[in-house]
């Protein structure tokens, strides 16, 4: 089998395509959450805390010298990233919890059908029936 044909079969499998779609949707969702945190949640929170812009929170490790920029530790941006993570984690947790609930409800609605008897079980039942028939004669 040629390398390209093998790769094409791998790439077109259902689970690989599903994974690619999930990654793309996840990236878009991440941008939406980042905007929600940066543009909607953090400004009112900063206002409640006295007009603070979290993006401006930083420690200067080394001041700027001429054309050399300052070295800073942006902990305000880190705080925003923590809010992003918490919101994404909460959304994913909620989605998984909902999916699990729907699966449980579906499983409860559909009673499990008993498995079909194996050939061994069918043969044993036939032997039992033959033995019963011989004893009743």
From Swiss-Prot:
* Pfam families noted in UniProt: MscL
Function, as annotated, reads: Channel that opens in response to stretch forces in the membrane lipid bilayer. May participate in the regulation of osmotic pressure changes within the cell.
Instruction: Describe its partners and assembly state.
Output: Homopentamer.
Q: What would be one Gene Ontology cellular-component term for the protein?
A: membrane
Protein name according to UniProt: Large-conductance mechanosensitive channel
Gene symbol of the encoding locus:
mscL
GO MF annotations, alphabetized: mechanosensitive monoatomic ion channel activity
Q: Which biological process annotations from GO are given for this protein?
A: monoatomic ion transport
Domain of life, per lineage: Bacteria
